[in-house]
């Protein structure tokens, strides 16, 4: 009778014994409610001949980041990879991003592979409730693929960006190609360029001046287009070269080297030294230009094309800076378009002078040198943009602040002798802007930056690996320990800093607690080991240990908690 009753009881309870139900039934309150990364993003792949399909099945309430998807071939060559369109996702800290829900399928054409070939796939995602996983890496073995004669193989190097994502990254570069036309117009008013325009216009027209404005316009436009074609070809060549070395150009040492070059180019704009082609090369180019027939469309076009290669001291630095910028972007379309618009901007004043005479030109004076120096500050913005990727956002803000203060101070000094009323108003505006721009520098000097306030308001002690944690635990004899896992890519971690750790009640509750923080942004082997040792699946995760170094049961925090909930959680911890 007892045996039958027991069997009936087990039969009735069997629906509860599925894995999910069993976990829910026996799960402790402090356990992680979020799925393991392999269950949240179920990854699979299949290769049929030269076509490889990568498939992610994404659980409801979870999403993958478009920008965090990277594909690296190893001993293989891949064709063009096209990512599907994602869904726009607004984030308080990272702004507008593109994510994938439910499913992501990526088709990877394999143009060449052997039996030892692989591709390394890296991806990262989050839970919508406020929980992010570290970057995941999967090794996908490839079957041998013999390259076809008609196959257009584009890369045997690591592919970190798809063509679409590379073009999207153009939005994050310091300026769009349309800004190049304004830069070109500005360069036209520097002391090395503007005084030459009347002479160039007379050379374009030749000894027999055309009678109609239409003829004059087409001659001037031919000269400008010749110059623009030369610059466009330079842009395409440099961008194509940059695309081949795109991964190397993202290396911190390369970014630092490019930044130094930009700074040297900018210093030449301030008159410290002059940059130009060797005189022998310039002489040869000038002789070739003089051999062209002026007054004819083809001859004028050829003169413009050669003039594009003859760089004056005022144009060498900006042109070199733009070329380096294009090489770093690796975007061939934007590269050619940027240089074309730059040349067109330089040519617009020349067209006006050729049509209507040099009376349209403003008088020469010191202001032309000021224009040249202003472009020096513009070039200095490029190394700041590049160095941000190496030194981080906090130092990046300080560099932008320093550059802004320098530029505004330069403008104030230039106008300080003027007695004009409007100039006085401009000086007042410049002073106000300088005070605003100095704020990040003031915060840094006094040690009160926003980042420091948010990250160190609780006086966290930073740890980097498992050995450091063990050593601290051994030395700790009487305090409760809180270990916070943080990463720059973790949105909810930043929410903890901004909304929870800054709360006075939370700070009071943790007053007698030893506060540790592990920054796992880089996902290094040591950081991975620390995560694995403590069974941390994702971030944010906060652990509490007693004075003996043992984790307090049911105390682990997974995901974001506001100040009220976190304060209640702290109150339930054993004292």
From Swiss-Prot:
Family, per entry: Belongs to the thioredoxin family. DsbD subfamily.
GO BP: any one term: cytochrome complex assembly
Entry GO terms, CC: plasma membrane
TM helices/strands, residue ranges: 180-200, 216-236, 253-273, 297-317, 336-356, 367-387, 394-414, 425-445
Catalytic activity: [protein]-dithiol + NAD(+) = [protein]-disulfide + NADH + H(+); [protein]-dithiol + NADP(+) = [protein]-disulfide + NADPH + H(+)
Cysteines joined through disulfide linkages: 126-132, 192-314, 490-493
Classification via PROSITE patterns: THIOREDOXIN_1, THIOREDOXIN_2
Task performed by this protein: Required to facilitate the formation of correct disulfide bonds in some periplasmic proteins and for the assembly of the periplasmic c-type cytochromes. Acts by transferring electrons from cytoplasmic thioredoxin to the periplasm. This transfer involves a cascade of disulfide bond formation and reduction steps.
EC primary class: oxidoreductase
InterPro entries reported for this sequence: Cyt_c_assmbl_TM_dom (IPR003834), DsbD_gamma (IPR035671), DsbDN (IPR028250), DsbDN_sf (IPR036929), Thiol_diS_interchange_DbsD (IPR022910), Thioredoxin-like_fold (IPR012336), Thioredoxin-like_sf (IPR036249), Thioredoxin_CS (IPR017937)
Localization per Swiss-Prot or TrEMBL: Cell inner membrane
Name of this chain's protein: Thiol:disulfide interchange protein DsbD
HAMAP family: DbsD
Start and end residues of each Thioredoxin domain: 444-575
Primary gene name: dsbD
Stretch forming the signal peptide: 1-24
